[in-house]
């Protein structure tokens, strides 16, 4: 629509109500169809009145030759009309692509795996961010000024941070213990995998709360900013790296099955220190990876990145580096380790 034009637009050929740009000109549906049919038939048209006929909504059918000429004068382009053969080829390709998308479906085993992951995630992780408000947040964290729901004074930001992070790790541990494939591993391997992946799984889950517009984490009635992390004691350079990771991942607009499969891939990493059953854990990670790949392929490609799976693998590798840096940060924030013995054990 032209700037400053609020009313309905008129067809450049006959003056009827225009429905949009067709073949490079603003026209109504009638003139669009007329132009397509006339050009496709490729019949010679001649005006009996030397091209002087008036073309408007009432008289547009009286002289096809003058109507066609007015279409061309308005800017409609013949070369934008596909031939019948080209149109048939395009429709065939579209049908083929739809068939390919439909063919890429999860196997029964993969469907059951996804349902198991989603169930455990819903029970222990899905609602944990709404519960942060229970840990006596400082008043400035509330998105809207409101009273605390409990008659206790707020905690200092550092203590609140320690409590919500301990709570997140506890919920992630419950999530993993709810997975039969994880419980089937030896206890020493369960501990090694959890020590390596707990923080990574927390951040994969936390990404669902990240707001791209404000670069904040929105957890129920609370809002956490980069500045809050600085006040806790994290280095700003590390926080910028962390927030860039979250922004990149959030832009992919992942669905919940994709998030939980990413988390499962992080969990079943055979190269974690202390792992003994490397081959079995490698097999489990491959199972998660193939399921994620199949799930992505089975989704319609509209608004999806063609290389989404490869980019998610890259982000998992980046998250590993962030995890290592996070452990270093935790160790060097004065007083924080003593408040978070569980996280201290995870990061050691």
UniProtKB/Swiss-Prot annotation:
TM region positions: none
Family stated for the protein in its record: Belongs to the nuclear hormone receptor family. NR1 subfamily.
Protein name per Swiss-Prot or TrEMBL: Nuclear receptor subfamily 1 group I member 3
Gene3D superfamilies on file: Erythroid Transcription Factor GATA-1, subunit A, Retinoid X Receptor
PTMs per UniProt: Phosphorylated at Thr-38 by PKC, dephosphorylation of Thr-38 is required for nuclear translocation and activation.
Keywords, comma-separated and alphabetical: Activator, Cytoplasm, Cytoskeleton, DNA-binding, Metal-binding, Nucleus, Phosphoprotein, Receptor, Transcription, Transcription regulation, Zinc, Zinc-finger
Subunit description: Heterodimer of NR1I3 and RXR. Interacts with PSMC4. Interacts with ECT2. Directly interacts with DNAJC7; this complex may also include HSP90. Interacts with CRY1. Interacts with CRY2 in a ligand-dependent manner.
DNA-binding region: 8-83
Organism: Pusa sibirica
SMART domains associated with the record: HOLI, ZnF_C4
């Amino acid at each position: 629509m032209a700037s400053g034009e609020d009313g309905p637009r008129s067809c450049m050929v006959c003056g009827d109500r225009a429905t949009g740009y067709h073949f490079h000109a603003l026209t109504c549906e009638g003139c669009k169809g007329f132009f397509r049919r006339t050009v496709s038939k490729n019949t010679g048209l001649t005006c009996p009145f030397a091209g002087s006929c008036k073309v408007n909504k009432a008289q547009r059918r009286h002289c096809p030759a003058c109507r066609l000429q007015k279409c061309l004068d308005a800017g409609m382009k013949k070369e934008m009309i596909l031939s019948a053969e080209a149109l048939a080829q395009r429709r065939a390709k579209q049908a083929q692509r739809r068939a390919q998308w439909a063919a890429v479906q999860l196997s029964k085993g993969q469907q059951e795996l996804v349902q198991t992951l989603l169930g455990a995630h819903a029970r222990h992780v899905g609602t944990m961010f709404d519960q942060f408000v229970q840990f006596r947040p400082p008043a400035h964290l509330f998105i809207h000024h409101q009273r605390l729901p409990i008659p206790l004074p707020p905690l200092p930001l550092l203590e609140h941070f320690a409590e919500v992070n301990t709570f997140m790790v506890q919920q992630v541990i419950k999530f993993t213990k709810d997975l039969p494939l994880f419980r089937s591993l030896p206890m020493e391997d369960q501990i090694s995998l959890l020590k390596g992946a707990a923080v990574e799984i927390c951040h994969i889950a936390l990404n669902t709360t990240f707001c791209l517009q404000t670069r904040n984490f929105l957890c129920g009635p609370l809002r956490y900013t980069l500045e809050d992390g600085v006040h806790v004691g994290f280095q700003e350079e590390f926080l910028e790296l962390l927030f860039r990771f979250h922004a990149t991942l959030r832009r992919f607009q992942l669905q919940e099955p994709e998030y939980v499969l990413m988390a499962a891939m992080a969990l079943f990493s055979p190269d974690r220190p202390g792992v003994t059953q490397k081959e079995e854990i490698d097999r489990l990670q491959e199972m998660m990876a193939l399921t994620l790949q199949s799930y992505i392929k089975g989704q319609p490609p509209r608004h999806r990145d063609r290389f989404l799976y490869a980019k998610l693998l890259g982000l998992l590798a980046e998250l590993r580096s962030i995890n290592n840096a996070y452990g270093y940060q935790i160790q060097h924030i004065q007083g924080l380790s003593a408040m978070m013995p569980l996280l201290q054990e995870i990061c050691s």
